[in-house]
Amino acid sequence: MKNWKKYAFASASVVALAAGLAACGNLTGNSKKAADSGDKPVIKMYQIGDKPDNLDELLANANKIIEEKVGAKLDIQYLGWGDYGKKMSVITSSGENYDIAFADNYIVNAQKGAYADLTELYKKEGKDLYKALDPAYIKGNTVNGKIYAVPVAANVASSQNFAFNGTLLAKYGIDISGVTSYETLEPVLKQIKEKAPDVVPFAIGKVFIPSDNFDYPVANGLPFVIDLEGDTTKVVNRYEVPRFKEHLKTLHKFYEAGYIPKDVATSDTSFDLQQDTWFVREETVGPADYGNSLLSRVANKDIQIKPITNFIKKNQTTQVANFVISNNSKNKEKSMEILNLLNTNPELLNGLVYGPEGKNWEKIEGKENRVRVLDGYKGNTHMGGWNTGNNWILYINENVTDQQIENSKKELAEAKESPALGFIFNTDNVKSEISAIANTMQQFDTAINTGTVDPDKAIPELMEKLKSEGAYEKVLNEMQKQYDEFLKNKK
């Protein structure tokens, strides 16, 4: 499932942020000192997000297993969603001696030498973890022939989906069986607009980009894509792909018809999944989400999903949640042992992600690896699954059907790798040109992508401005040159 905080962080992390050392205040975590652990090393981990209220209890339970298996203790310090990129930038540049962190701006910091090379550690301390990883994770996280990340195994492939509010579907008797694209979405938006005028038909925000079967060699702020339905040996501009332009025309029709909020290009309004203020939205769904089960559980109501892109393994899906070991860590081997354990030991991982057994959850008798959540399971009494450890050793909630489990296995087995998986664009020769393109894109991108302006008028204006500056052709040619070399070396 697309977690709004997760993806907001991922988007923000592409921007280099500068801040003073004071920005590293307000760390939240376990305050016990290394002296409390005797001579066992305390491994310090930085994690993104809000600290669970019962973090001390979660870590106490976890450390019983970690001490026995690894001979070390884990200390987790949380940095807030909005602060993480800025604070980790300061921590990294200051050379602080931490051990493990949720990766921020992974490729850039790996290239800078901020992270430890884990290639050899994977052969010994991380060998069990390595065996459990889909090979796509290694391909997508290899930088200049070396691997610096311990990825959280989850949705190595994912698709974009329309997620419909099941309460409103049932209340107004709306049939979504024919919805497969933006173009076929229009009739149901018309129905909800007429039947429930106070509901936002298509709930999108200013960071919205229409979904398609594209792979982005660089951040979405630039228009360059590999068209997975076209010539996959070429880098192209998404605004010059005919079907993408049709999506934009359709979105403009939605905007003019009032299906999209009028202030979408400027508003920070979010739409709570649990409320009935919206009819349909977009969500990223992967095999580890078991169809609509996770969305429905989080929303506390039925959510119906309709896929609009294919399940593809891309760099983006392999880098959603990476852990790294600091190059300055004095405990690299122990750190890797803990990450290995976290991703291979079900008792350890489930105790963190579900919380304390008996309070937060209980096993269902006669059903292997199935659990029922209890009253103690709340948002602030456990850690997140997507950014903690291997989702495939997590117990499965009772609301997941056997058919959903089988479907997930099938999706995972059939998911294809993007031809660009593992391609990392070296921007050293075109940094100023990329900045120039990004500045131009900021003038047009949001209005075009949200349907606010007529794409037949705005896209030619954008392309004329891009091509008049010289930077556009230089970056495109450099990217194509590097991509050609990448494809040549793959053969």
Curated annotation (Swiss-Prot):
It is found in: Cell surface. One of its GO terms (biological process) is protein homotetramerization. This protein has potential use in the development of vaccines and antimicrobials against pneumococcus, because of its extracellular localization and the essentiality of carbohydrate import for the pneumococcal metabolism. The characterization protocol developed for this protein can be helpful in structure-based design of inhibitors for the carbohydrate-binding proteins in general. The keyword Ribosomal protein does not apply. One of its GO terms (molecular function) is protein homodimerization activity. One of its GO terms (cellular component) is ATP-binding cassette (ABC) transporter complex, substrate-binding subunit-containing. Keywords: Metal-binding, Sugar transport, Transport, Zinc. The keyword Cell membrane does not apply. InterPro entries: Bact_solute-bd_prot1, DUF3502, SBP. Zn(2+) binds at residues 212, 247, 252, 256. Pfam families: DUF3502 (PF12010), SBP_bac_8 (PF13416). Exists as a monomer, homodimer, homotrimer and homotetramer; oligomerization increases with higher protein concentration. Probably part of an ABC transporter complex involved in carbohydrate transport. Belongs to the bacterial solute-binding protein 1 family. PANTHER family: ABC TRANSPORTER SOLUTE BINDING PROTEIN-SUGAR TRANSPORT, ARABINOSE-BINDING PROTEIN-RELATED. This is Carbohydrate ABC transporter substrate-binding protein. It comes from Streptococcus pneumoniae serotype 4 (strain ATCC BAA-334 / TIGR4).
